[in-house]
Amino acid sequence: MAQPGTLNLNNEVVKMRKEVKRIRVLVIRKLVRSVGRLKSKKGTEDALLKNQRRAQRLLEEIHAMKELKPDMVTKSALGDDINFEKICKKPDSTATERAIARLAVHPLLKKKIDVLKAAVQAFKEARQNVTEVESSKNASEDNHSKNTLYSNDNGSNLQREGTVISEQEVKETKILAKKPIHNSKEKIAKMEHGPKAVTIANSPSKPSEKDSVISLESQKTPADPKLKTLSQTKKNKESDSSLSGNSDGGEELCEEEKEYFDDSTEERFYKQSSMSEDSDSGDDFFIGKVRRTRKKESSCHSSVKEQKRLEKVFLKEDTGETHGDTRNDKTKPSTETRKLESVFFHSLSGSKSSRRNFKEQAPKTRSLDFPQNEPQFKNQFNKKLSRRLENTKQQLQLPLHPSWEASRRRKEQQSNIAVFQGKKITFDD
């Protein structure tokens, strides 16, 4: 902080050089005039000698002022309060001292020096205030750092206490959680031991029950052979009735297929195909119907085959077990097989006949419909040709572009150029 103050003061001293030089010139002029007045005065010899001594001293001051440097004048003026009268009355005062005092006392220079002195004083006071403020700031920072350290210590202590308390709580909760787990394990073990004993006690009783059931069954079987044969015949009758019901269901499905596949739909389809030009889409539609009927037929056949196999198995069992009622049993399966065969072959014959009818009807209808449509196609083709010819004629009648016309004329002229009819000139001529 001291260097900028001194630098500023030195700068001010440098700025004062011009003022000092200007004031020095003014003072020298004044002194020259006073020297001339003193030499021109007349009087007694003592007065003349006195005036000569004064004039000599003024000349010495003038020469000293010329040799003085302006910085020296300003520094001496700023340093001490100069009193010109005191310095002149001193017998030992030199010409340079008197010259400096005379320049410093000049009113113009005195004003500037007073301003500089006030600035220096203000700078010193500001410097003292800055040091005081810095010292106060340092003291406050020290106090703040001490407070923060104290607060941090308190916070760390509180955190440690909180962590210790939380750890204790966690340990207590773990201990409490372990106790019910052990209790539950003991209860489960007790429960497991109880049912095991019960099962061990009950298990010996099971084989005795099984033995009793077997003995009862063995007692029942030799006593009632007739009842067994009757029960088997009843079972066979029930199975036959279920098979007949299934066969009736198969007949109903085949009848539904027949209703779904009527001749009226075929006739309508072929009429539509004969009227429309795109017959492929109709064929695809009808082929889709045929595929659906095939899927249903295949499902019917599979169900009927399974029924037939079951019937054969039941028939074998009946023939092996019952010898007394063979005639009745033979009559019943024969009728059932006839029914099954009739249902089975009827569905197949019906589907085949429907397919044959479809194959036979389709070419007939097409052979009948296409000759009727032939004149219509011819008329349409003729109309299209006539329209194209009319369009080409209209295009030819339209005016050509001028560039096309010019090229056409040029070609005509080139084709019409007459052959050269003059004499050929040779070098001999």
Curated annotation (Swiss-Prot):
Superkingdom, natural source: Eukaryota
Residue positions where N-acetylalanine is found in the record: A2
Keyword Phosphoprotein: yes
Comp. bias (Basic and acidic residues): 183-195, 311-341, 357-367
Region Disordered: start-end pairs: 128-285, 311-429
Primary subcellular site in the record, as a coarse category: cytoplasm
Transcription regulation keyword on record: yes
PANTHER family linked to this entry: SERUM RESPONSE FACTOR-BINDING, SERUM RESPONSE FACTOR-BINDING PROTEIN 1
Record's protein name: Serum response factor-binding protein 1
Organism of origin: Pongo abelii
Protein encoded by which gene: SRFBP1
